[in-house]
Amino acid sequence: LFIYGVNVKKRILSGIQPSGELHLGNYFGMMSRMIEYQEKNDLFCCIVNLHALTTIDDKSILSKNTVNAAIDFIALGLDPKKTTFWIQGDVPQVCQSTWLFSNITNMGLLDRSTSYKDKIAKGLKPNVGLYSYPILMASDILLYGAHIVPVGKDQKQHIEIARDIAIRFNKIYGETFVLPEPSIEKNNRLVPGIDGNKMSKSYKNTIPIFGSEKIIRKRFMSILTDSADINEPKDIDSPLFKLFSLFLNQSEIDELKDRFLAPGMRYGDVK
């Protein structure tokens, strides 16, 4: 799929799990950036349905989610004429390379995965698929010769693992894979869920993009806040403030901050 050194233009790669309905974390964490990148870059974007197997074991649900994710992504602005867009599981070489990479990856590299430890702490069932998740992600990245992988700060370690695997493979078999670089925007913010943790379907704390008015309203009204009195300053580090800020420009964020710190406002007014 990729021949070392042939590509001149920098290739950007990103993917999204079809774990359920798309939410604000998907859009502000990755999708909005991809829609912007497709205008001037060699963008590769895929629906990573194999990764979703760590949380979904119902074939019909996964199939439905995969199709819906592709439809929703296009509805939000991804243009297949400007982007290489595909379903991860449709390329068997991904699994083949994952097995090859597994045999040159030291256990210690995976043992240090903070993402795995965090997911287990949040209640996800530990299994080999979840543990070896970074190797499958490395296949996604290396197989397509990605130079740049936009990620949040919490995903940077996965790119570092992919680099380590590429370096070891190249050392054993000769120069084959590009060494990918993570791209973390300086203003990139972790999108909080309604409970204050990272918004994730795994944590059941999401706000859907295409949900009904009733569902979206219920989720917003459930956003975690403290018990500050109406005349007390409100917490600008709260998930409510951070979520609201995603929809605002800097001057509007400053105005919202003033409202939070001034007396007379209730959290319910913002919701």
Give the residues covered by each predicted segment:
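Short, polar/flexible loop-turn hinges at active-site or ligand-entry regions and domain interfaces
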Residues: K59, I148-G152, T176
